[in-house]
Amino acid sequence: MQNQRIRIRLKGFDHRLIDQSTAEIVETAKRTGAQVRGPIPLPTRKERFTVLISPHVNKDARDQYEIRTHKRLVDIVEPTEKTVDALMRLDLAAGVDVQISLG
């Protein structure tokens, strides 16, 4: 796997789970002899929702909610076969979305 790169993007609502999963990925890659760049924190997406509390009148009575989507990026440069095999066997938290691309 010469001159290749694995780019891993992690997304989730809980930043602690993302940081924990990122640490597991980095530790696994370094243990198998690959060079790691990252974790790089990407901008957090904040979605805000405003909901009327009252069913009929009182437009002033509102609640506001927010969902934050945290993202991290990890690049693994020149991965070995052991690195790819170890990453495939890695079991990450359920609240983390993982996207892997080869480049």
UniProtKB/Swiss-Prot annotation:
Gene3D superfamilies: Ribosomal protein S10 domain
PROSITE patterns registered for this protein in UniProt: RIBOSOMAL_S10
Entry keyword annotation includes Ribosomal protein: yes
Single Gene Ontology MF annotation: structural constituent of ribosome
GO cellular component: ribonucleoprotein complex; ribosome
Keywords: Ribonucleoprotein, Ribosomal protein
SMART domains per UniProt: Ribosomal_S10 (SM01403)
Pfam family, one: Ribosomal_S10
UniProt entry tagged with the keyword Coiled coil: no
GO biological process entries: translation
Free-text function comment from the UniProt entry: Involved in the binding of tRNA to the ribosomes.
Quaternary structure annotation from Swiss-Prot or TrEMBL: Part of the 30S ribosomal subunit.
UniProt record similarity statement: Belongs to the universal ribosomal protein uS10 family.
Name listed for the protein in its UniProt record: Small ribosomal subunit protein uS10
Originating organism: Shewanella denitrificans (strain OS217 / ATCC BAA-1090 / DSM 15013)
Gene behind this protein: rpsJ
